[in-house]
């Protein structure tokens, strides 16, 4: 897999310029931007759209910049962007700020893609090493409200009781590790990897066993992985923990015996968004709706505005630009935690970076890491306005497998009442290409969730209004 962004720097807003003039004889470029949540998908779709002679015979291009949902909407309303993406809803005040002739009736707002918001963290000193931490909504809310400041807080420990962990799902469901006791001295370990993991130039699948609290560690498998299911008969003794690594990326551990987890007293550093962010809006809404006594403010694109109180200024909260910036910050700081769309975490894990996704407790009582499948189930359990396509999540739905912190990203485009140029034709072609071709083909590979058929139908009806 070719990584969509370099990790050294986060996203930066580029200078905003108008659309290149369109002529019948030449391709045109549509200047667009907005949410960073769908950025990895947008990069893939706009690249293939440019070369798709069926959907885009003229070879037109979409120049999309991830600047955050709030800035994206503002630039769209000012007509600096001909197309924008936003993970949060627009406000009438934003239209008023943009001024005439912008009105609520001369643009289209339609759902294009969904995805999971992962709670990403980086923590050394967890025992057993490689354990993927679990968190309830109350624990997540307290951490991001600065009410929990150390990793060995009793609330985090309570979410991670002594228990067996015979199943490990990682990399957006691309890796599945299962363990079953076979006899007093043997166990069966199965590793199921998708072609995506293998095609990522992964050199080695490494499995180690440890007993006596990690005092005795043995490498029991170290070979190039293959796509499909690998079944191994592995040595077993009571208390054995098996760690699974792809090159340098530790996926986690499995065990058939109840194992106590030990956490270090490392201070927690929270990475939040610097920009006005739809990811923040959805994340804060989840906290407010599930834990209103802890996170007692209504949601907002600005983290500091949604924060229940005053954000600490002692360095325990760090602002970062975009989903990329948050993921970069978390992977670079021991004790860090943040929130980002699942693809930004997975691509770093595949590159061997130190970052993990906490398993979040859903309404069915399951602890799950964010995934395309979990997000799809959450969208399916949400309420959708058939006229507008706006999705309202029930964060405590009891659907098995539904990941609770899920968001939808919406496209924004003009009607003929605002813009009568051929820009609209290009934007409409691109939106339909995303819905019909690109998202169904690559969304899950990139870490997103394609919209259900019923929602695509609504989006297509809305897209028909672009330029009309």
Describe the predicted segments one by one:
Residues 17-25:
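C-terminal segment of classical bacterial N-terminal signal peptides
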Residues 26-186, 190-206, 211, 215-224, ...:
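Flexible loop/hinge segments at secondary-structure junctions
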């Amino acid at each position: 897999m070719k990584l969509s962004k370099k990790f050294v720097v986060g996203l930066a807003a580029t200078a905003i310029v108008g659309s290149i003039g369109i002529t019948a004889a030449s391709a045109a470029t549509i200047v667009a931007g907005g949410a960073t949540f769908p950025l990895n998908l947008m990069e893939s779709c706009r690249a293939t759209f440019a070369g798709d002679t069926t959907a885009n015979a003229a070879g037109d291009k979409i120049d999309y910049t991830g600047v955050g949902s709030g800035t994206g909407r503002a630039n769209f309303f000012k007509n600096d962007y001909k197309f924008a993406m936003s993970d949060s809803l627009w406000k009438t005040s934003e239209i008023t700020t943009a001024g005439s002739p912008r009105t609520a009736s001369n643009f289209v707002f339609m759902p294009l893609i969904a995805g999971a918001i992962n709670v990403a963290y980086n923590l050394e000193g967890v025992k057993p090493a490689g354990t993927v931490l679990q968190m309830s909504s109350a624990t997540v809310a307290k951490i991001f409200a600065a009410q929990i400041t150390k990793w060995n807080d009793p609330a985090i420990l309570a979410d991670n009781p002594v228990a067996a962990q015979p199943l490990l799902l990682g990399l957006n469901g691309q890796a599945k590790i299962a363990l079953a006791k076979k006899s007093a001295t043997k166990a069966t370990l199965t590793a199921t990897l998708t072609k995506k993991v293998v095609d990522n130039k992964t050199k080695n699948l490494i499995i180690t066993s440890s007993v006596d609290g990690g005092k005795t560690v043995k490498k029991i498998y170290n070979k190039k992985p293959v796509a499909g299911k690998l079944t191994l008969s592995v040595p077993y003794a009571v208390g054995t923990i098996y760690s699974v690594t792809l090159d340098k990326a530790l996926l986690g551990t499995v065990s058939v015996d109840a194992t106590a987890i030990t956490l270090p007293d490392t201070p927690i550093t929270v990475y939040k968004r610097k920009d006005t962010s739809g990811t923040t809006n959805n994340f804060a809404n989840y906290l407010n709706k599930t834990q209103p006594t802890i996170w007692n403010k209504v949601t907002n694109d600005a983290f500091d505005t949604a924060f229940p109180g005053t954000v600490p200024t002692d360095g325990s909260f760090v602002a970062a630009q975009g989903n990329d910036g948050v993921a970069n910050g978390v992977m670079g700081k021991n004790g860090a935690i943040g929130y980002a769309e699942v693809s930004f975490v997975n691509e770093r894990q595949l590159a061997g970076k130190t970052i993990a996704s906490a398993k979040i407790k859903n309404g069915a009582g399951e602890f799950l890491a964010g995934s395309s499948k979990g997000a799809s189930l959450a969208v399916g359990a949400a309420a959708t306005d058939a006229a507008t396509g706006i999705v309202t999540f029930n964060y405590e739905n009891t659907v098995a497998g539904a990941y609770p912190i899920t968001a939808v990203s919406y496209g924004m485009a003009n009607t003929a009442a605002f813009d009568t140029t051929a820009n609209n034709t290009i934007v409409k072609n691109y939106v339909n290409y995303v819905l019909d071709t690109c998202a169904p083909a690559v969304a899950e590979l990139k870490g997103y969730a394609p919209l259900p058929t019923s929602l695509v139908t609504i989006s297509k009806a809305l897209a028909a209004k672009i330029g009309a």
